[in-house]
Amino acid sequence: MKRPKQLLAVLLMGAACTMQAQRSEALLEKNWKFSKGDFKEASQPEFNDTKWESVVIPHDWAIFGPFDMNNDLQNVAVTQNFEKKASLKTGRTGGLPYVGTGWYRTSFDAPADKEVTLLFDGAMSEARVYINGKEACFWPFGYNSFHCNVTSLLNKDGKNNTLAVRLENRPQSSRWYPGAGLYRNVHLIVTDKIHVPVWGTQITTPHVNKDFAAVRLQTKIDNAGEKTAIRVETEILSPEGKVVTRKENTSR
C-alpha cells in the first residue's frame, strides 16, 4: 500500500478493537524475594523464603558491591592490545561480585480460562523459569528479551501461582560488567485464547521517498481454543488520528 510519507505514523489495531480490549499487561515489580546462592528446592511453592531479601524489580544483585579487585581476576591475553601471552588482570568487569547463582521468587494471580505469558526484558544470565515447581523455559542469553507461555502450568483452583527464577553468571563469562539478576522489567501478559502473540506484529517500510511510502504490516494470530472463524482488521491512521486505510482478513 502506498501513502504519503507523513502517514508513516501507523497504528495496527491488533486483530480488531475488541481483541485489543481483551489483552492486559502488568509489571511484576513488587513483592519479590531474592537470595544469592543455590537452593535445591527454591522452585517449589512450599519453599520457605521468608528470610530472603525483599527486592523490587528491576534488581541487580552485584551493583551495590562490595567492590573487590579479587572479584574479577582473569588470566587472559587481550588480543585487541596485541597480547600473545595470558597474564593476570583485574578490574575488567568493575570489581563487582556478579559471578555466582541467585534466585528470585514471587507469586501472582491469573485467570484459568485465559492465555498467560511471562515476558522478561533482560535476565543475567542462564535464566531458568519455574511456575509452581515446574520448569517453564530456559534462556541463556542475558541481554536478550525472552518470553514463555505458562498457561498449562497455572493453578486451576484459584490459588496464587509461584514464580521462581534461577540465574547463574559463570566465572570469566564477560569482558565488562554485565550486571546480575533480573535487571530489567518482568511483564505478565493475559490474553484470550485467540490473540496476537508477543512480538506477533511486524511493521516495515521497504520503500520511502519524498512522494510516497510503502507500509508493510504482518500479524500472527494464535488460537489456543476451539477452531473458529477469525476476523483481523488492520487500520493505518494519519498523525491526526484519522483512518487512512482499512483492511480486513478472515480465516477459518
Where are the model-predicted features located?
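Short flexible loop/turn segments that cap and initiate beta-strands
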Residues: 45-46, 228-234
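Contiguous beta-strand segments within globular domains
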Residues: 207-219
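Aromatic (tryptophan-biased) beta-strands that constitute blades/sheets of beta-rich domains
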Residues: 51-53, 137, 244-245
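Accessory beta-strand-rich segments of carbohydrate-active enzymes
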Residues: 24-28, 37-38, 94-202, 224, ...
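Extended carbohydrate-recognition surfaces in non-catalytic/accessory domains of CAZymes
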Residues: 22-119, 179-182, 213
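Intrinsically disordered, low-complexity terminal/linker regions enriched in Pro/Ser/Gly
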Residues: 217-221, 231-234, 246-247
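Bacterial Sec-dependent N-terminal signal peptides
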Residues: 1-23
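Edge/loop elements at the starts and ends of beta-strands within beta-rich repeat scaffolds
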Residues: 213, 223-228
